[in-house]
Regions:
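Hydrophobic anchor at the beta1->P-loop junction of P-loop NTPases
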Residues: 17
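P-loop (Walker A) phosphate-binding loop of NTP-binding proteins
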Residues: 20
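ATP-binding Walker
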Residues: 23
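Walker A/P-loop
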Residues: 26
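Conserved substrate/cofactor phosphate-moiety recognition/catalytic segment
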Residues: 30-81
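Glycine-rich phosphate-binding loop used to anchor ATP phosphates in small-molecule kinases
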Residues: 66-111, 117-118
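Small-molecule kinase domains that catalyze NTP-dependent phosphoryl transfer to phosphate-bearing small molecules
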Residues: 104, 130-180, 185
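Conserved phosphate-donor/acceptor-positioning beta-strand/loop module used by diverse small-molecule
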Residues: 110-131
Length: 190
């Protein structure tokens, strides 16, 4: 198990840990925190929000579960200004931001490394049906969206140069692989 507390990683300051719904981003975030890293969950720590794609307006109280057709109009978006603030706060230590948003390309330039967690369809179905920390994916429309995006996420991030990690493995191994990706980029343990 690799552990560290706020260590500057040879110039790498901000790592984006992304992947489809159900790949384990929030779980990885929690383990990174437990190991002493600065790790933030984009879903829980105010980095993302629902927006109306037609108007750009923020959705203050989104429905849960979403009704049919809702995801065609509304999207989960990351707020660039929040990530820019995190970049400034992370100049002397490494930080991990864990999440996924449809406008990730708008903030990709702010990250020193992108890690994409991937899982197979059976694992995705199982995780979305049984997870207790987030209800997204239990409703048929949400599940359909997650299944549609699962193969696309890997392709998008591989093309963009991300480090792809098989997140169907035990979480400690997945987190070790995330840390190894940072070490591989910097030549030192984060």
């Amino acid at each position: 198990m690799r552990t560290s507390v706020n260590v500057y990683a040879g110039g790498v300051t901000l790592v984006w840990v992304t992947g489809n719904s159900g790949t384990g981003k929030s779980t990885v975030c929690g383990v990174l925190r437990a190991r002493g890293y600065v790790a933030l969950d984009a879903d829980e720590d105010g980095f993302c929000r629902w927006i109306d794609r037609a108007t750009g307006e923020v959705v203050v109280d989104p429905p849960d579960p979403v009704p049919g057709g809702w995801l065609d109009r509304y999207g989960w978006a990351i707020v660039r200004e929040r990530v820019e603030t995190l970049v400034e706060e992370s100049r002397s230590r490494i930080a991990f931001l864990c999440g996924s948003a449809e406008n990730e390309a708008d903030v990709r330039d702010l990250f020193d490394l992108t890690v994409c967690l991937v899982i197979d369809e059976d694992t995705l179905r199982h995780r979305l049906a049984t997870r207790t920390t987030n209800t997204f994916g239990r409703h048929p429309e949400e599940l359909a969206a997650a299944l549609k995006w699962n193969p696309r996420m890997r392709a998008i991030h591989e093309t963009g140069g991300a480090t792809v990690i098989d997140a169907s493995k035990p979480v400690t191994e997945v987190v070790d692989n995330v840390i190894d990706a940072v070490q591989g980029l910097t030549g030192s343990t984060p």
